Amino acid sequence: RLVMGHTQGKGCYCFVNGLLSAQVGKRAQNYKYIVVDNEAGMEHISRGILPGVDAVILVSDCSRRGIQAVGRIARLIPECGLKPKKVGLIVNRAPGGVINDGVREEIEKQNLELLGVVPQDEGVFDYDSAGTPTTQLPADNPVRQELYHILEGLGL
């Protein structure tokens, strides 16, 4: 397991970034999709470690400050030389699966495309607390259903 955002030495990500670049390069031709899940930020992208990016999916909690942070990251995408076909936002852990007017206003202010709203769910909390993979959530779980809906809408 490769964990981004943790240094191998004082302030240096070189080893981890080199490892990521080599592994993605070796495997890219064998897969239709490669998902890179990382902590907030664009370091490994800005350093040119990934050969190309088709989609950037930004995930935020259901707060105005979270949306503002995602907006700042979205504005960095062109500065990093990326030209993804799709840039979008998923709001996670929304109470009742609904975003309020303030959060919706901030999404519009940040000029973000809303891909979907994932509800806060006790089932996910229970699975996580028990160490059970969330991939085992039942098909009728609202989080699972929303994620399938988002994936279908991406059209990748």
What annotation goes with each model-predicted range?
Residues R1-K10:
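Conserved P-loop NTPase mechanochemical-coupling segment
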Residues V3, I90, T135:
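Residues in well-ordered beta-strands of folded domains
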Residues Q8, H44, T134:
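Short, flexible micro-motifs
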Residues Y13, N100, D140-L147:
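Generic structural signal for well-ordered, non-membrane alpha-helical segments
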Residues C14-V117, D126:
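Conserved catalytic-core segment of NTP-binding enzymes
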Residues E122:
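Acidic phosphotransfer microenvironment of two-component signaling modules
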Residues A130-N141:
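C-terminal boundary of histidine-terminating zinc-finger modules
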Residues E146-L156:
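C-terminal alpha-helix
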